[in-house]
A protein has these predicted regions:
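P-loop NTP-binding/switch modules centered on Walker-like glycine-rich loops
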Residues: 1-70
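Charged, flexible cofactor/metal-binding loops and thiol motifs
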Residues: 42-127
Length: 127
């Protein structure tokens, strides 16, 4: 990380472990099936999670406050076939908040605050 500061360059971490990422980065891009579905400052992503996939990733992290043996949350279903992606939201088949219209058109990233927090979900205001 010192080299990053000295050279003024960015570093990209690709991982499913958001617990580790929070200590290493300032901004997060959450991707699903090749699309950025949520992005923002670490605090915004952790404190105001907007996308169901991001909620699932964070919900799957163990907590020191939980009793031993507490079952972790898992995201149901399987990722889509990347060769034949659906036309709508790529997370549609696994989303517990889905509606029929989510299957028809892929949502674009929508800015939700001045810090750059953005989400690609038709229902983010409701969930």
């Amino acid at each position: 990380m010192n080299l990053q500061k000295e050279m003024g360059m960015s570093v990209m971490w690709i991982t499913h472990d958001l617990g580790i990422v929070a200590e290493m980065v300032h901004k997060i891009n959450v991707m699903y099936a090749g699309f950025i579905i949520e992005q923002g400052l670490v605090d915004d992503i952790y404190d105001e999670t907007l996308h169901p996939y991001t909620k699932g990733l964070l919900g799957s992290l163990p907590s020191i406050d939980e009793a031993p043996g507490t079952k972790l949350i898992s995201i149901p279903g399987l990722p889509p076939d990347l060769i034949t992606l659906p036309s709508g939201c790529p997370f549609y088949a696994r989303c517990t908040y889905r509606r029929d219209y989510c299957r028809e058109e892929r949502p674009e990233l929508e800015s939700v605050n001045a810090n750059g927090h953005a989400v690609a979900c038709w229902r983010w205001r409701e969930i």
